[in-house]
Amino acid sequence: MWKAAAILFKGLFAAACVVVVWQALGPPDGPGSLIPWDKALHGLTFFVLTGMALLAFPKMKLWRVAVLMLAFGGLIEILQSIPLFDRDAEWADLLADVVGIGAVIGVAIAVALRRKLPA
């Protein structure tokens, strides 16, 4: 059962990463976007992706998950700087990614510390 769940979480995480890259490199959303503020979208996206990464790789150290997610966000920004994609790379986008990543890592640390406290 757990092995099937692990495979499912890894597959869902990989699929989500592909969708994020596809969206990040495709044409920019118009004014009808579900979340109108770009930075909120970045933070929310990386909040969800980081949570999915923790489920997909439960034995990976938190700092490694954070570094890998930051690298993923950085890679997206680098790719967006290539004129072929007609997108713009922004440090503020990467900072919003960090906020989303940090929020999940912070919750994971709080949960881990709470489990260590006596009942």
Task: Show where each model-derived region lies.
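Bulky hydrophobic segments
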Residues: M1-A92, V98, G102-A119
